[in-house]
Amino acid sequence: MEKKKVVLAYSGGLDTSVAIKWLQEKNYDIIALCLDLGEGKDLAFVKEKALSVGAIKSYMIDVQEEFANEYALMAMQAHTLYEGKYPLVSALSRPLIAKKLVEIAEQEGATAVAHGCTGKGNDQVRFEVSIQALNPYLEVIAPVREWKWSREEEIAYAKENNVPIPINLDSPFSIDQNLWGRSNECGILEDPWAAPPEDAYEMTLALEDTPNKPEFVEIGFEAGVPTTLNGTAYPLSELIKTLNALAGKHGVGRIDHVENRLVGIKSREVYECPAAMTLITAHKELEDLTLVKEVAHFKPMIEQKITELIYNGLWFSPLKQALNAFLQETQKNVTGTVRVKLFKGHAIVEGRKSEYSLYDEKLATYTAQDEFNHDAAVGFISLFGLPTKVYSQVNQKKVEA
């Protein structure tokens, strides 16, 4: 029987390494796909490991700039904080991974794609909904969800089939990382009362270890896109990396969150997002300076919906594309510079300026230079309060009667 081809999203860990052997037993030729999302792994080693385990071909693709410009940027502009806290670190990368899986599958003539997600997480939904949106004819295989092995059973299978056991297998944590941040769950973190141990963190320093002197950074934006740090221009992926190091050194971006998962359970996760939280904070302040009130007040409703769509795996949905069109329209004048103080876990905006600033000091001042027409306030108040006044008059008459 001729073997079918499957493209596997490969991380180099135990689950996806075992999946190669498991898929071989199901009569598949496996093509491994590993993406460089800025997590800092030795991906050349991961690429070769896939071949040594049994893949017939192995791809390693650097998608850092694509991830930064087409995914993280939108999240920043939409101030996406799921349940007010989580900047969608993992949720943002899943549609890009799904997109590349589909592209390689079509290029290689594969009939299926596979991922290493379990049956109780959000990522299985994000991957499979995205894949269906991009190519509804591809079969999607989820080996870990199908085999339902315990960790001990999986290790035993790996040993029987000469699959290398990762040296960090004893780590209690499940970690996912990319340019936009780092997520950490499992182990002691499953107890919502337990304080996260310091070894749960990698990108940020504990407050006790951060500098006792603040550091200032000026972030330049052009049409909503961060382009400079302290006057130096960077590609967006490099700007994010640089800011991760700067803000992380000051303990910015630590998040401890009990979140409501898409699949109906609550999960406690620890996130580190120094650049994401700094950029979202700075960008919001620049919008406050440059957007008219009606747009500034309406945009958070769109942001909330965009956040939910991304979290729920609906990146490629028609609604998300439509809302993105609104989002891009709001960014045309979000150009300027924001000065941020990084200190003891905080990213504090201390100054902002823009050629499109709608702040008029002559109208806002209380000094002798005040140009605001105070006399106009009388008529404005009369008209603005008229519906409330009429309502009160009518109802007071009924009470008196």
UniProtKB/Swiss-Prot annotation:
Keyword check for Lipid biosynthesis: no
The protein's Enzyme Commission number: 6.3.4.5
InterPro entries to which the protein is assigned, alphabetical: Arginosuc_syn_C, Arginosuc_syn_N, Arginosuc_synth, Arginosuc_synth_CS, Arginosuc_synth_type_1_subfam, AS_cat/multimer_dom_body, Rossmann-like_a/b/a_fold
Residues given in the record as L-citrulline binding sites: Y86, N122, R126, S174, S183, E259, Y271
Record-listed ATP binding positions: A9, Y10, S11, G12, G13, L14, D15, T16, S17, G116
Highest taxon listed in the record's lineage: Bacteria
GO biological process, one term: argininosuccinate metabolic process
PROSITE patterns (alphabetical): ARGININOSUCCIN_SYN_1 (PS00564), ARGININOSUCCIN_SYN_2 (PS00565)
GO CC terms: cytoplasm
Subunit structure: Homotetramer.
Catalytic activity: L-citrulline + L-aspartate + ATP = 2-(N(omega)-L-arginino)succinate + AMP + diphosphate + H(+)
Pathway(s) served: Amino-acid biosynthesis; L-arginine biosynthesis; L-arginine from L-ornithine and carbamoyl phosphate: step 2/3
Class in the EC hierarchy, top level: ligase
UniProt-annotated binding residues for L-aspartate: T118, N122, D123
Presence of keyword Nucleus: no
Keywords, comma-separated and alphabetical: Amino-acid biosynthesis, Arginine biosynthesis, ATP-binding, Cytoplasm, Ligase, Nucleotide-binding
Family: Belongs to the argininosuccinate synthase family. Type 1 subfamily.
Originating species: Bacillus thuringiensis (strain Al Hakam)
UniProt-listed HAMAP family: Arg_succ_synth_type1
Signal peptide extent: none
Compartment list: Cytoplasm
Protein's name in the database: Argininosuccinate synthase
